[in-house]
């Protein structure tokens, strides 16, 4: 169907996006054009960079991934947007971003981290809602096919390259971490659940490991879609196909967690692909038959872009295709004609 939503965003569907890192924030930038009813459920397993420093010094959950989502959904003047992204270059604050420090300050003022996130959301007048998947202090442990293991999200990639084998499983420590009740409620009320692109083992899967998340997804009648990465990731998914990504997600949750997977079929400049290959990454091969054998339908669309030599999802195209999938499903379920649903179209 050659369509995409053109309804007013305030009347858009209730969408939950699950993930972390730049993949989730990229998705959110596009989704806000189509619906105001967005809930981002964000991993808090990060322990590197400026987030890791604040986590260690202040005993708070890492703010970085949540800050990225704030930047994507904020409705502020350009100067405020610049301020959020400003990173100190020298002195004791070198490497820290103002956005991280703002969230850290709010965490000191307000009783809980999720309240601090809500407070920052109000300050920035964000579209939708951002929720940490849990407010508990969690770490990520990776176990490898050769029997070795390591603790710490920020060291998994380098350790994997040393071991030269695949990641077998990741776990949260403690394994008893409970999901934020608001996250469970959002999933249960969602009309569409999107597993965002991003680091498979360190951004997406950690959300699924928090107690209550997978059960809530299983109970939900929402349309569930995985937006697969475009390129493999050095230090995590070298050599992975689309079905390998899906299998990893199912192995850390349950078979049939979702039945649709959106992949990119747009072409990329060979010069860019070659540069990725030199760094140990490549375009993810879509082994459609293997995916279908797991009960997952592949939807392929041109959703990639190249920004400063980096392959990324085009936020507008990605959101547009996802909204089209939701609308098509709405038509089928309702048994309605296109005229009974707000018109939407795909631009060429």
Spans of features found by a protein language model:
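Metallocofactor- and cofactor-centric catalytic cores in central/energy metabolism, strongly enriched
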Residues: 2-9, 14-18, 22-28, 33, ...
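Conserved phosphate- and dinucleotide-binding cores of soluble alpha/beta proteins
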Residues: 2-11, 29-34, 39-61, 179, ...
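Active-site gating loop/helix substructures
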Residues: 138-197
